[in-house]
Regions:
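Auxiliary Fe-S-binding modules of radical SAM enzymes
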Residues: 1-92, 278, 282, 301-373
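Conserved strand-turn element in the central/C-terminal portion of the radical SAM core barrel
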Residues: 216-228, 276-301, 320-327
Length: 373
């Protein structure tokens, strides 16, 4: 059903949105001396693995757009590089300044350890301002059986503790909250060989967090066909402070789904539809999200039809560029062009408007950047 809610999007993505995608699809070269500086003084715990977060500040309202940079092999040819100019940090394109950037300070909790001796920076990290993120299990069952999703390198995301416990997650979240730097938590996991595929641990983590601190939580999980178990776990998550659900389909193109996702791709799109329906029944409108990856062999038509399919159900489908990670099967691929991404964004925005969806509306903190996608 088409919504009549008064939601409107500009057809113009804005300067920051365009800069964001330009930097993501090219990568940013960071010289060795700045790698050490960022790791020590700023929020960059995974920079030696090519992953770090910068922010672009609006000159109009000073709001920040978060940019996740993944420097895969493709980034060695990037025209963009970071420099330090006095106390400020800048991105230059070749020999000319491109933009100022804002970095998040190095959190104090990164220097702490959990009660069982695990460094907290190995348990959870700041993914953007006010937002803590953790991946409970970084040993995905699909990787273990030799059938990983070809775009994924979950084991290399950051030097995290490979199998984090809910107690460690809750303790780390409490430390970050007491520092005054988080309002949201996103919990995800590599697939586990369990009935709930790891969602059980996410729910337990949310439950323990809710006992300690008042934050909103996003649960990010793999779909399952045991819908009775799914509903039970999601309702428990909701009761434990989870406000937003993220179940990523990654690709709508039926011609390549099983090629790029040998296990996940066997799940029919109809399964995702049924999972999203249950998420919507529990979490409500504008609280259910999915992600579509661009640049893994799919067609533009499949992406835009996928955005429409999801939106017609009440699900926000975020279109993101494939920035190939080192360690993934597809690590040697090249990201999609900036022009292609901008075209897809421009084409997707009216679809969200048509169905009254808020691209950045999840109260769990997911996609809280106000410009760009």
């Amino acid at each position: 059903m088409v919504s009549t809610l008064p939601i409107a999007y500009t057809s113009e993505l804005g300067v920051l949105g365009k800069k964001k995608i330009e930097l993501q699809t090219n990568g940013i070269i960071v010289p060795p001396d700045l790698v050490e500086d960022l790791e020590k003084n700023w929020n960059a715990p995974a920079i030696r693995r090519g992953r770090f977060v910068i922010c672009l500040e609006s000159q109009d309202d000073k709001k920040l757009t978060t940019v996740l940079i993944i420097n895969g092999k493709f980034a060695v040819n990037s025209p963009y590089h970071m420099i330090k100019n006095g106390s400020n940090y800048e991105i230059w394109k070749n020999d000319a300044k491109y933009t100022d950037i804002v970095l998040m300070p190095h959190p104090k909790f990164y220097e702490k350890v959990t009660r069982d001796g695990v460094p907290m920076y190995e348990v959870a990290v700041l993914g953007e301002p006010n937002h803590l993120r953790s991946v409970l299990n970084q040993r995905c069952a699909h990787h273990v059986c030799g059938k990983p999703c070809k775009f994924c390198a979950i084991e290399n995301w950051w030097a995290g503790h490979p199998n984090k416990t809910p107690a460690q997650i809750a303790e780390t979240a409490e430390a970050a909250y007491q520092e005054g730097i988080i309002h949201h938590v996103t919990l995800s996991t590599g697939t586990k060989a369990s009935p709930g595929k790891g969602l059980e641990d996410i729910v337990e983590s949310a439950r323990l967090i809710s006992r300690k601190i008042p934050v909103s939580t996003t649960v990010n999980f793999e779909p399952m066909t045991d819908y009775v178990l799914l509903e039970s776990l999601l309702r428990e998550a909701k009761e434990s402070g989870a406000t937003t659900a993220l179940c990523n389909i990654e690709c709508f193109d039926s011609n390549i789904r099983e090629v790029i996702m040998p296990v996940k791709g066997k799940l029919a799109i109809d399964v995702y539809d049924k999972v999203w329906e249950r998420c919507l029944n529990i979490f409500g409108e504008n609280e259910v999200y999915t992600m579509i990856i661009t640049g893994i062999g799919e067609t533009d038509e499949s992406i835009l039809k996928g955005v429409e399919f999801a939106a017609s159900r009440g699900v926000v489908a975020s279109v993101v560029p494939h920035t190939p990670m080192i360690g993934a099967t597809y690590e040697a691929m090249i990201p999609p062009s900036t022009e292609r991404m901008l075209y897809l964004f421009e084409a997707a925005l009216p679809i969200y408007e048509k169905y009254g969806l808020k691209l950045y509306g999840g109260t769990g903190g997911i996609y809280t950047s106000l410009k760009g996608m």
